[in-house]
């Protein structure tokens, strides 16, 4: 019995520690600052010299008549940001280089009490630097010019996806030395028209187009000069070292905020900012992706499949962290045209869409070392939600199904506890008989177990077998963006944050107290005191846990109480009639 209790206490302590480290909430995101194009976006580009410097492998750019004549009736020719809006994205493009410097997620409000303020993903203001950069570098690439990055022209200063329109194309043009460039952004409608407003509000995966948060980026190079053009396509994500504004924990430990890449040896390789502080990462990769992760959301560049790219991470002179890639050398003969493209994903961690975009990208939903158990659990939870339409009730239904699946193991555990409870008077007598002689008391206990055919670990091992599944479910509820701002009923308007009135944690503590009353009292006084404190300790921890986690624990405890009460009464009744 001592061994059983000790193992259970250690297991519960480990689970509690892991849960505290994984607990997150989504308050405190800063407002999107006013648009500003004055920030320096050249710093950190691959093989890019400074504006005042020169580079031995990049010729000095000089304007030409051919370049000026190729301009196609520009309207916006300034450093003013180009605004683009779809039904799911609200973003700004800096004409200086054509970088996406601001991006808000319209379907994911910053807070429930501010539904009109979208969650800010990209930002290049005074408080935070986080942007998606792409361009052409190399021998003739305009982004490698000593004069600085190219200033693109656009036909409009703002673009918006119209009703009934499924695709929005934004072209930026630039001409230099007889070469005409078009940087084309392609945006897509995010929500399906055949879904109701209620289904869209529930963010059902069936109502979200798979390319909703994908931005197609392509370069059209029209070489009208008298020589062959040569350059390389690059893309990168640049972020400063500030904390994730959407994720903090009760202990001050943030969830993973950093880079990740796909490599042939690892479909999901995390590269933290600490790793970038120590050394650069470089590897030649065919296809794959590079990404920057934060709680619930991810941004990723996905190059053309089949092409060889140089993936790298580094830290620039301004303290920004960069993850990106450079593509193979492009060669455009005089009088020819070439197009090269890639895809940017910027949005929530929707596993189905991420997996379809590029293999391994769905692993950015980081379920920890038990991901192989967590992913099937999430798959089942998502299918239940497609039928029920409420994540709170879906959690309850999933808890019931898991409890049914482990019913035989749980029943074995409770039967063992019931037998221990039945012989507890004999155990107490042994304790009183041998007093402080622990060796004799242990020998007498083992003889009692053997005589009564009781396995002291019989009630513990079944619980330990189930623990990986329970822990995986916790991580599913913690890391899945579907839980963010998802209501259940009544006062629970967001399953991803704490219960505002602490009702569920108090109920959870009550269920733990009832469970304790059904279990036999430990013979060791110290263990008995520790077990009595467990409901209080857990209630305190769970006061700040996401309501979805506490809901799972409450339902699981209630089912366990019912099962244990039934089995215990059945065994006691059989003992009386024997």
From Swiss-Prot:
Listed GO CC annotations: plasma membrane
Location in or out of the cell: Cell inner membrane
Residue ranges, compositional bias (Polar residues): 37-66
Protein's membrane topology: Multi-pass membrane protein
Domain of life, per lineage: Bacteria
Annotated transmembrane regions: 3-23, 361-381, 387-407, 457-477, 500-520, 535-555
Record PANTHER family: CYTOCHROME C OXIDASE ASSEMBLY PROTEIN COX18, MITOCHONDRIAL, OXA1
Listed NCBIfam families: PRK01318.1-3, yidC_nterm, yidC_oxa1_cterm
Family of this protein: Belongs to the OXA1/ALB3/YidC family. Type 1 subfamily.
Protein name per UniProt: Membrane protein insertase YidC
The encoding gene: yidC
């Amino acid at each position: 019995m001592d061994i059983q209790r000790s193992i259970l206490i250690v297991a519960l302590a480990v689970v509690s520690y892991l849960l505290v480290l994984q607990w997150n909430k989504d308050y405190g995101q800063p407002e999107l600052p006013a648009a500003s194009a004055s920030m320096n976006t050249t710093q950190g580009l691959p093989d890019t010299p400074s504006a005042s410097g020169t580079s031995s492998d990049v010729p000095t750019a000089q304007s030409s008549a051919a370049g000026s004549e190729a301009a196609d009736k520009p309207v916006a020719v300034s450093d003013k940001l180009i605004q683009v809006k779809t039904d799911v994205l609200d973003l700004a493009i800096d004409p200086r280089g054509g970088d996406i410097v601001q991006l808000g997620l319209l379907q994911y409000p910053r807070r429930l009490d501010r539904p009109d303020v979208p969650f800010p993903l990209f930002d290049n203001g005074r408080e935070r630097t986080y942007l998606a950069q792409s361009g052409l570098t190399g021998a003739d690439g305009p982004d490698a010019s000593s004069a600085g990055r190219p200033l693109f022209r656009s036909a409009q200063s703002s673009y918006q996806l119209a009703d009934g329109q499924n695709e929005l194309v934004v072209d930026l043009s630039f001409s230099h030395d007889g070469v005409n460039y078009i940087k084309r952004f392609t945006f897509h409608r995010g929500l399906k028209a055949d879904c109701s407003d209620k289904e869209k509000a529930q963010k059902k995966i069936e109502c979200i187009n798979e390319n909703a948060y994908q931005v197609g980026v392509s370069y059209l190079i029209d070489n009208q000069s008298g020589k062959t053009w040569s350059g390389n396509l690059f893309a990168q994500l640049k972020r400063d070292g500030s904390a994730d504004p959407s994720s903090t924990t009760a202990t001050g430990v943030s969830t993973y905020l950093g880079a990740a890449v796909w490599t042939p040896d690892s479909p999901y390789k995390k590269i933290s900012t600490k790793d970038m502080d120590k050394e650069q990462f470089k590897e030649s990769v065919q296809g794959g992706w590079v990404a920057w992760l934060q709680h619930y959301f991810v941004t990723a560049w996905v190059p053309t499949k089949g092409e060889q790219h140089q993936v790298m991470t580094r830290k620039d002179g301004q303290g920004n962290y960069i993850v990106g890639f450079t593509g193979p050398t492009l060669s455009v003969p005089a009088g020819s045209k070439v197009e090269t493209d890639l895809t940017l994903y910027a949005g929530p961690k929707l596993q189905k869409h991420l997996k379809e975009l590029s293999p391994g990208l769905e692993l950015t939903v980081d379920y920890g070392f038990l991901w192989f158990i967590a992913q099937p659990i999430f798959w089942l939870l998502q299918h239940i939600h497609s039928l029920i339409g409420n994540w709170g009730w879906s959690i309850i239904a999933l808890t019931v199904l898991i409890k049914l699946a482990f019913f035989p193991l749980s029943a074995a555990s409770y039967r063992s506890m019931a037998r221990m409870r039945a012989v507890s008077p004999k155990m107490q007598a042994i304790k009183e008989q041998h007093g402080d002689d622990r060796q004799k008391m242990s020998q007498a206990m083992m003889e009692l177990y053997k005589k009564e055919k009781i396995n002291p670990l019989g009630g513990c091992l079944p619980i330990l077998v189930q623990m990986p599944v329970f822990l995986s479910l916790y991580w599913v509820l913690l890391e899945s963006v579907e839980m963010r701002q998802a209501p259940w009923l009544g006062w629970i308007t967001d399953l991803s944050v704490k219960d505002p009135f602490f009702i569920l944690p108090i109920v959870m503590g009550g269920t733990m107290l009832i469970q304790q009353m059904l279990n036999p009292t430990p013979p060791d006084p110290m263990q008995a005191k520790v077990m009595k404190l467990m409901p209080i300790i857990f209630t305190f921890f769970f006061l700040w846990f996401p309501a979805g986690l506490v809901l799972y624990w409450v339902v699981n405890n209630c089912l366990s109480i019912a099962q244990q009460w039934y089995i215990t009464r059945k065994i006691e009744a059989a003992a009386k009639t024997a």
